[in-house]
């Protein structure tokens, strides 16, 4: 009898030993932030959350963080998400407070029909977005893991549209938006950076520069990127290398500049470069193909690195537009065109024709193997092209006008 009792006790102990770690793992994997407060902000519902750190993030010490979820003015199922990274001079609360006044860090102001997620990196020392000070190199750092996990949690918790998640930031937050956003094209549809404080973060995260992308690293097609920086802002130094890298990689970049300093007031910036809000970055969807325009004939000369006192404003790819028509297993089709003067109020001279290379990104259904041949047509023009080592197809030297013209790409049988 005693032997039976000892065996039964041993079984119980063994079960508990297995259950405890399993329970701990389940709790860690679940990671449920605590809703600390419900309130109202500018006529919109506001939820305040607090949470600890997941072990997988890799923080050296335990820490607590806060994030805010701002609801749209009208409840909406499957709404898009606007994600905001604050500057070095703000924290999550003061960042949101800027949205009470037009002209105060306008990039922080979430559209009324969007949910918005405001994240914090001020509470814990060395946890800043740009990562280059503490987490150098291409590896995914703890802050980035926290941001991405929080975004995914909010999308799921609130039932949002995972294909319409947009990342933006000002200054240090702009640097973080580039550095975190470009590496996560599987999360963010598009990124917009207002006077990003440096491009070192994004350059290291994306292997821009002399070091090639390692063979064991796969980079998802990145978000469409909008960047507006000033040549008379010391934080913009190095942009020539960033712009070149984006062009060489055939990534989508809409770039604007002018002597507006380290500004955050759109009204003042628009007086210097009235194109900075001309591209509808919030219309990009993660589950739709897009064209990356490179080597465009209409690009302005860069002020970086040695014409920083130049008073001229300029742009890269500012006038290109597209409309998706078809994305099927046998072909992908989209209309390419230039913005018309009737649709774009600007002091810039709007070109009537441009020549550019066009690379198709985020193609959903047409599968092209690396090195495989495809046939293409663009109006009366036609030809063949081969996919690069990542399976990306580029058609070089297309002449694009204000008249929408269909680019069609098919696999070669």
State where each predicted segment sits.
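Bacterial N-terminal signal peptides
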Residues: 8-18
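A domain-start/cap signature at the N-terminus of enzymes
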Residues: 24-81, 243-244, 381-382, 390-392
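Alpha/beta-hydrolase-fold serine-hydrolase catalytic core, especially in secreted/extracellular enzymes
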Residues: 27-30, 248-254, 260-413
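Gly/Ser-rich "nucleophile elbow"/oxyanion-hole loop immediately N-terminal to the catalytic nucleophile
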Residues: 76, 133-172, 182-187
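Loop/turn elements at helix/coil->beta-strand transitions in domains of secreted/extracellular proteins
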Residues: 76-81, 111-116, 161-165, 184-190, ...
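Active-site machinery of serine-nucleophile hydrolases
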Residues: 81, 87-150
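Primarily recognizes the serine-hydrolase "nucleophile elbow" in alpha/beta-hydrolase
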Residues: 162-218
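The feature captures the conserved acid-bearing segment of alpha/beta-hydrolase catalytic domains
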Residues: 197-284
């Amino acid at each position: 009898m005693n032997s039976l009792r000892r065996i039964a006790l041993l079984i119980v102990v063994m079960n508990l030993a297995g259950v405890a770690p399993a329970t701990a793992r389940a709790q860690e994997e679940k990671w449920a932030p605590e809703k600390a407060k419900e309130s109202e902000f500018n006529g919109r519902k506001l939820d305040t959350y607090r949470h600890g750190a997941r072990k997988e993030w890799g923080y050296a010490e335990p820490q607590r963080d806060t994030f805010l979820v701002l609801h749209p003015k009208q409840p909406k199922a499957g709404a898009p998400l606007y994600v905001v990274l604050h500057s070095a001079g703000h924290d999550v609360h003061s960042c949101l407070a800027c949205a009470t006044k037009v002209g105060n860090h306008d990039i922080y102001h979430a559209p009324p029909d969007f949910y918005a997620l405001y994240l914090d990196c001020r509470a814990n020392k060395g946890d800043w977005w740009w990562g280059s000070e503490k987490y150098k190199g291409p590896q995914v750092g703890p802050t980035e893991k926290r941001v991405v996990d929080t975004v995914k949690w909010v999308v799921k918790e609130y039932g949002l549209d995972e294909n319409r998640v947009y990342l933006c930031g000002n200054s240090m937050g702009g640097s973080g938006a580039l550095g975190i956003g470009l590496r996560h094209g599987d999360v963010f549809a598009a990124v917009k950076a207002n006077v990003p404080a440096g491009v070192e973060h994004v350059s290291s995260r994306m292997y821009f520069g002399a070091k090639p992308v390692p063979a064991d690293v796969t980079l998802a097609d990145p978000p469409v990127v909008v960047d507006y920086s000033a040549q008379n802002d010391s934080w913009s130094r190095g942009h020539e290398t960033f712009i070149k890298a984006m062009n060489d990689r055939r990534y989508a970049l809409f770039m604007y500049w002018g002597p507006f300093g380290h500004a955050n007031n759109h009204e003042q910036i628009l007086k210097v470069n009235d194109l900075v809000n001309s591209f509808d970055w919030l219309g990009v969807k993660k589950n739709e193909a897009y064209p990356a325009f490179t080597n465009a004939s209409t690009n302005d000369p860069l002020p970086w690195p040695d014409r920083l006192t130049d008073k001229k404003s300029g742009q890269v790819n500012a006038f290109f537009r597209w409309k998706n028509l078809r994305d099927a297993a046998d072909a992908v089709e989209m209309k390419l065109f230039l913005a018309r003067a009737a649709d774009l109020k600007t002091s810039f001279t709007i070109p009537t024709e441009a020549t550019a290379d066009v690379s198709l990104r985020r193609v959903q259904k047409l599968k092209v193997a690396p090195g495989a041949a495809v046939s293409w047509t663009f109006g009366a023009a036609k030809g063949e092209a081969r996919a690069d080592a990542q399976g990306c197809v580029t058609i070089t030297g297309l002449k694009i006008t204000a008249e929408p013209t269909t680019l069609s790409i098919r696999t070669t049988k």
